[in-house]
UniProtKB/Swiss-Prot annotation:
Residues 21-187 form a propeptide. Disulfide bonds join 311-391, 351-375, 353-358, 407-436, 418-431, 420-426, 430-453, 444-450, 449-475, 462-482, 469-501, 494-506, 513-563, 528-574, 541-551, 558-600, 594-605. The keyword Transcription regulation does not apply. Highly glycosylated. Ca(2+) 3 binds at residues 470-471, 473, 485. Residues 200-396 form the Peptidase M12B domain. Keywords: Blood coagulation cascade activating toxin, Calcium, Disulfide bond, Glycoprotein, Hemostasis impairing toxin, Hydrolase, Metal-binding, Metalloprotease, Platelet aggregation inhibiting toxin, Protease, Prothrombin activator, Secreted, Signal, Toxin, Zinc, Zymogen. Ca(2+) 2 binds at residues 406, 409, 411, 413, 416, 419. This is Zinc metalloproteinase-disintegrin-like berythractivase. Glycans are attached at residues 260, 348, 374, 432. Zn(2+) binds at residues 336, 340, 346.
Length: 612
């Protein structure tokens, strides 16, 4: 039995001298100082790696001893993980850091079944853990030759801004709860069931704007550590959904922004969407990207994303404001926006996750959550059944996720052609469970273009077109995977020439009126749109430094949207929607037809050929 000395020091005698963003802010009301003691599990004389796969630490919380069990998060980075920043003269600098022996862990508290932890062990212990239903943060002091750490409850961190923080996603034409309740009862085809059962992988890229670079004093290492800690927590949140979020790239706009990052979150999302599809995806293969910005979005918005867009070459993105020094809060927001990409909508009052608030709540709770609700899980399940996004089946473990290959663990790893589990449990005729190689004559195990262990014939449709702006995909005869979901070129006429395709959708004013006002709504007369020349809350085109800029006469149909309600008892032929906390809502969406042959682009009504 190892004798462990645990010391708690009176706070008055131990002024903070560390480097923590949270503690340095002076916003922590109360914390205790502890000395975590590592309890080694390695035998005497064994070679100690720098960061072991599993570790235990003992320390006290509120005078009671706790044992923190940690396991290295081997799914955090992909092997081809790369980092990009820019030199002062604008040159792109790409590096491939060695991340095999990283220091990021998930964990739990001994004898607490409801506990969890996300910890960086790079220089002391930094992160958070849940103990007896309460969230605690732990951070090391920056003191010479000291193992002292601060432990404090999340509730003891004073909030600089008590205003509610909201997700900017505001679609109102969401499906009712009834179909969601029935989603788990659907009769699934064998292919659908196989897709649901397969482990999913999101190859994830984080982009930081120039404001973030300046916020962290041009310190690339400090920025990287923060992102690693955040994604480590994100990764943990998706484990119960059988999804591994693997960081495959980090891009830092150290020279200057690649897009116009503005306080109008919807506009910034559109610009980042276009940049990702036209630029980033061509340089770095990935499934999903998020922009983390220091820009303060208008109103209470702190994030925004496209719903049901995972794997889309443009729309699989989100944008997030770095609004808090608490990594858990930002990680929860990033997980929330990725949840939208995976088909999840906001929770309502009937949704539960066993905590006061869940990840997909529209407003960020004072009690941060790491749990997805039952509604979120059913939304995601229904989205996966209907769309079966193929990029999630790309198994980064084959060449990317760092983990020693073990045949029989049902994870496809380096050197394996398949892995169906142990010989006793494997029922797959395409895979040899003993060797993790394909059986003789087999070409594949699973995929939309795999049928009875063979590739489907060239030209076999594997994904039908969903609407006017989508395109069908067909098997190549050379792969088990259905090709990446593609869509009509931007500017292609859609919905009987009432609109033009834009990033795979057909935005029309009529549909936007129905979404905002109600099922009987129609687009208002042209005269109503003249109010957009006033430059006030109810009529403008753009904002500059918080000031509403009037529309030019030719651009009035690219500002605030005006609708005719047409509901019984309503007599408002020029109705517009204005939300002070989310001013972007109610504006005509980018790509919307504003005249024959013209679309809204950057809040101007321009020729389709000019826009695209």
């Amino acid at each position: 039995m190892i004798q462990v000395l645990l010391v708690i020091i009176c706070l008055e005698a131990f002024p903070y001298q560390g480097s923590s963003i949270i503690l340095e802010s002076g916003n922590v009301n109360d914390y205790e100082v502890v000395y975590p003691r590592k309890v080694t599990a390695l035998s005497k004389g064994a070679v100690h790696p720098k960061y072991e796969d599993a570790m235990q630490y003992e320390f006290k919380v509120n005078g009671e001893p706790v044992v923190l069990h940690l396991e290295k998060n081997k799914g955090l980075f992909s092997e081809d993980y790369s980092e990009i920043h820019y030199s002062p003269d604008g040159r792109e600098i790409t590096t491939y850091p060695l991340v095999e022996d990283h220091c990021y862990y998930h964990g739990r508290i001994q004898n607490d079944a409801d506990s969890s932890a996300s910890i960086s062990a790079c220089n002391g212990l930094k992160g958070h853990f849940k103990l007896q239903g309460e969230m605690y943060l732990i951070e090391p002091f920056k003191l010479p030759d000291s193992e002292a750490h601060a432990v404090f409850k999340y509730e003891n961190v004073e909030k600089e801004d008590e205003a509610p923080k909201m997700c900017g996603v505001t679609e109102t034409n969401w499906e009712s709860d009834e179909p969601i309740k029935k989603a788990s009862l659907l009769n699934l085809t064998p292919e659908q069931q196989a897709y649901l059962d397969a482990k999913k992988y999101v190859e994830f890229v984080v982009v930081l704007d120039h404001g973030m670079y300046k916020k962290y004093k041009d310190d690339l290492d400090k920025i990287k550590r923060r992102i690693y800690e955040i994604v480590n927590t994100m990764n943990e949140m998706f484990i119960p959904l059988n999804i591994c979020v693997a960081l495959t790239g980090l891009e830092i706009w150290s020279k200057g922004d690649k897009i116009n990052v503005t306080s109008e979150s919807w506009f910034t999302l559109i610009l980042f969407t276009n940049w990702r599809g036209a630029d980033l995806l061509k340089r770095k293969s990935h499934d999903n990207a998020q922009l983390l910005t220091n820009t303060d979005f208008d109103g209470s918005t702190i994030g925004r994303a496209h719903i049901g867009s995972m794997c889309h070459p443009y729309l699989s993105v989100g944008i997030i404001q770095d609004y808090s020094p608490v990594n858990l809060l930002v990680a929860s927001t990033m997980a929330h926006e990725m949840g939208h990409n995976l088909g999840m909508h906001h929770d309502n009052d009937t949704c539960t996750c066993g905590a006061p608030s869940c990840v997909m709540a529209a407003a960020i709770s004072k009690d941060p959550s790491k749990l997805f609700s039952n509604c979120s899980q059913e939304y995601q399940r229904k989205y996966l059944i209907k769309n079966r996004p193929q990029c999630l089946l790309n198994k980064p473990l084959r060449t990317d996720i760092i983990s020693p290959p073990v045949c029989g663990n049902e994870l496809l790893e380096v050197g394996e052609e398949c892995d169906c589990g142990t010989p006793e449990n494997c029922r797959d005729p395409c895979c040899n469970a003993t060797t993790c190689k394909l059986t003789p004559g087999s070409q594949c195990v699973e995929g939309l273009c795999c049928d009875q262990c063979r590739f489907r014939k060239t030209g076999t449709e594997c994904r039908a077109a969903k609407h006017d702006c989508d395109l069908p995909e067909s098997c190549t005869g050379q792969s088990a995977d259905c090709p990446m979901d593609d869509f009509q070129r931007n500017g292609h006429p859609c919905q009987n020439n009432n609109g033009y395709c834009y990033n795979g959708k057909c935005p029309t004013m009529e549909n936007q009126c129905i979404d905002l006002v109600g099922p009987k709504a129609t687009v208002a007369e042209d005269s109503c749109f003249k109010d957009n020349q006033k430059g006030n809350d109810y009529g403008y085109c753009r904002k500059e430094n918080g000031k509403k800029i009037p529309c030019e006469p030719q651009d009035v149909k690219c500002g605030r949207l005006y609708c005719n309600d047409n509901s019984p008892g309503q007599n408002n032929p020029c109705k517009c929607i204005y939300f002070p906390r989310n001013e972007d809502r109610g504006m005509v969406l980018p790509g919307t037809k504003c005249a024959d042959g013209k679309v809204c682009s950057n809040r101007h009504c321009v020729d389709v050929a000019t826009a695209y």
